[in-house]
Amino acid sequence: MAYPFQLGLQDATSPIMEELLHFHDHTLMIVFLISSLVLYIITLMLTTKLTHTSTMDAQEVETVWTILPAIILVLIALPSLRILYMMDEINNPSLTVKTMGHQWYWSYEYTDYEDLNFDSYMIPTQELKPGELRLLEVDNRVVLPMEMTIRMLISSEDVLHSWAVPSLGLKTDAIPGRLNQTTLMAMRPGLYYGQCSEICGSNHSFMPIVLEMVPLSYFETWSALMV
């Protein structure tokens, strides 16, 4: 989860988020190099006493500043497309969970079980226990097995919502009448927090998401008690 005054992204918990962090660093380095070059050129222009009033054209320079940006764009686009295809790839998920957005709560249905579904509401501030997080705790957490591929089917009952968990690299729109899907895999156990990331009305800020990633044996025990 995020911490006060945090400058970087949240710690990666899934392979997709790790790839996104690498891509972020890759792109940031390119931006840093370009910015340094531009700043250097501006400094030279402001400090040099040389002028080129007789220069009418520079074909070589124009060629360079046409080809070089194209190469830079390719260097950014190729890893981006690779991650995009990775995010869309769904191979033999071990579990499927259907998520529906409502004003202003989430409902979950484990489609591999006959009667395992529940609603997840935010716990009001006045009901929080010591150590719990304001605006992020829910009455029913989504318990999922770690180190397994899980498919999330996401839609909405009313208006546009967006189901997002930053530490897993997830953000999928919940659109009425449309069923979107995404996959997740957590590499370690723990609680992972998210929120609705699409403005959906007056209580948009009160739609938290809490995933509890646990070992498979614990998940099987929990699901048996819930059914």
Curated annotation (Swiss-Prot):
SUPFAM superfamilies: Cupredoxins, Cytochrome c oxidase subunit II-like, transmembrane region. It comes from the Eukaryota. PROSITE patterns: COX2 (PS00078), COX2_CUA (PS50857), COX2_TM (PS50999). It is a multi-pass membrane protein. Residues 46-59 are mitochondrial matrix. Keywords: Copper, Electron transport, Magnesium, Membrane, Metal-binding, Mitochondrion, Mitochondrion inner membrane, Phosphoprotein, Respiratory chain, Translocase, Transmembrane, Transmembrane helix, Transport. Binds a dinuclear copper A center per subunit. GO terms for molecular function: copper ion binding; cytochrome-c oxidase activity. It is found in: Mitochondrion inner membrane. It catalyses: 4 Fe(II)-[cytochrome c] + O2 + 8 H(+)(in) = 4 Fe(III)-[cytochrome c] + 2 H2O + 4 H(+)(out). Cu cation A2 binds at C196, E198, C200, H204. The modification Phosphotyrosine is found at Y218. Its cofactor is Cu cation. GO terms for biological process: ATP synthesis coupled electron transport. The chain crosses the membrane at residues 15-45, 60-87. GO terms for cellular component: mitochondrial inner membrane; respiratory chain complex IV. Component of the cytochrome c oxidase (complex IV, CIV), a multisubunit enzyme composed of 14 subunits. The complex is composed of a catalytic core of 3 subunits MT-CO1, MT-CO2 and MT-CO3, encoded in the mitochondrial DNA, and 11 supernumerary subunits COX4I, COX5A, COX5B, COX6A, COX6B, COX6C, COX7A, COX7B, COX7C, COX8 and NDUFA4, which are encoded in the nuclear genome. NCBIfam families: CoxB (TIGR02866). Component of the cytochrome c oxidase, the last enzyme in the mitochondrial electron transport chain which drives oxidative phosphorylation. The respiratory chain contains 3 multisubunit complexes succinate dehydrogenase (complex II, CII), ubiquinol-cytochrome c oxidoreductase (cytochrome b-c1 complex, complex III, CIII) and cytochrome c oxidase (complex IV, CIV), that cooperate to transfer electrons derived from NADH and succinate to molecular oxygen, creating an electrochemical gradient over the inner membrane that drives transmembrane transport and the ATP synthase. Belongs to the cytochrome c oxidase subunit 2 family. This is Cytochrome c oxidase subunit 2.
